[in-house]
């Protein structure tokens, strides 16, 4: 049966296209939109936080620089070898540190002196060297280093937004980090996936502040949600298809039955009338199918009978045209022999009568190949009387081939054509070779006559396709058309010839119309 899409299949597709798929699409669009908005908001937040942190650090740096500038002269009057001056220096530096919002530590180092507020002996290598300054105390130069451990704003950003801060130098060496996943002193290598970050320049030393956020957890949550949605979608699709199939089966059972009957009617296997299970309007279609099938069957039988009659008429007409053509040539021979050899003329008349009895037999259009060969031998014998035994006939055939059944008068035109167009002043040798192969009889008729030029050969080949009742050339054209009527396109007739080298005709006759070699 030809493949088609039943109504229930279309119902499944409609259910998916109109309900399940749009809902799933809306959810996907919503989820993608949510993540797009989330990424956009996070980018804006990171941008805002990096600007705020930069501003805060710049403000602290400016206050420290202002303090150093204002107290530079007073520091020069102090002598750090004096205990009271050391205490005054510590007091001023602590005042500077405590005025800043960041957690800062200082180290003042010089000749035989080291002052710091790092009383807990924290490792300053884990802190950011915020700034360095040279201070002069009583003609002695000291180095002031200020370290940043943290700032309230960075801590707030880390706590509230889970955004972490890094400070790196121009070579991407990490100088500060409030995330344990990074080690100070190592190279900063930005992650390509699962991280969002933004950086800004901090100072003239090309230090950069980086605020970043790890969104792996959010992505994993989104993937988990997508998996859950996919599972739910699959379950919905399965449930929807099963429901639609059950509903469609109940509602379209009669439709499928009618489609099946149409298929059977197309292949002429409908059978007797069978009503539908459900009494509905579809019963009218069912009745119409059977009525149309019966009408078509009657019409087909009528056409087949007409075609058979037409083939019989055409075959008889072709055979009728063969007889005058042959009789004319033979009667000329008899007329010639009556004067020279009445006894031989009597023999020719007897042979001619046997041939006419064979050709006018109307009870069947088929004969054994052996009968056709006997007819050809009598035909050549008559022609030899006319042409002084110039024709030599050789038949090569197996016994099995001789007992095959073929159409009557299917070989004689080949011999007639060889004698008529191949004979010259010298003798003419004609060889008939008969072979069986793959349900076909292969006939090869070869002569050593004058042959044909290439233009004449092309003309003869083209004339084979002319209408049998229109052409004036009877022989091969009649034979070819008769074969087409009796055997259809399975029969083949090929002509090969060269000038002064003879002619070869290859003729294939199907022995079984049901299994032929095309």
Curated annotation (Swiss-Prot):
The keyword Signal does not apply. PANTHER family: SENSOR HISTIDINE KINASE YPDA, SENSOR PROTEIN KINASE HPTS. Member of the two-component regulatory system HptS/HptR that regulates genes involved in hexose phosphate transport system in response to changes in extracellular phosphate sources. May act as a sensor protein kinase which is autophosphorylated at a histidine residue and transfers its phosphate group to the conserved aspartic acid residue in the regulatory domain of HptS. In turn, HptS antagonizes CcpA-dependent transcription of a subset of CcpA-regulated genes involved in antibiotic susceptibility. Its EC number is 2.7.13.3. One of its GO terms (cellular component) is plasma membrane. Its main location: membrane. Autophosphorylated. It holds the Pfam family HATPase_c. This is Sensor protein kinase HptS. GO terms for molecular function: ATP binding; phosphorelay sensor kinase activity. Residues 297-513 form the Histidine kinase domain. Keywords: ATP-binding, Cell membrane, Kinase, Membrane, Nucleotide-binding, Phosphoprotein, Transferase, Transmembrane, Transmembrane helix, Two-component regulatory system. It is found in: Cell membrane. It is an enzyme of class 2 (transferase). The modification Phosphohistidine is found at residue 325. It is a multi-pass membrane protein. It comes from the Bacteria.
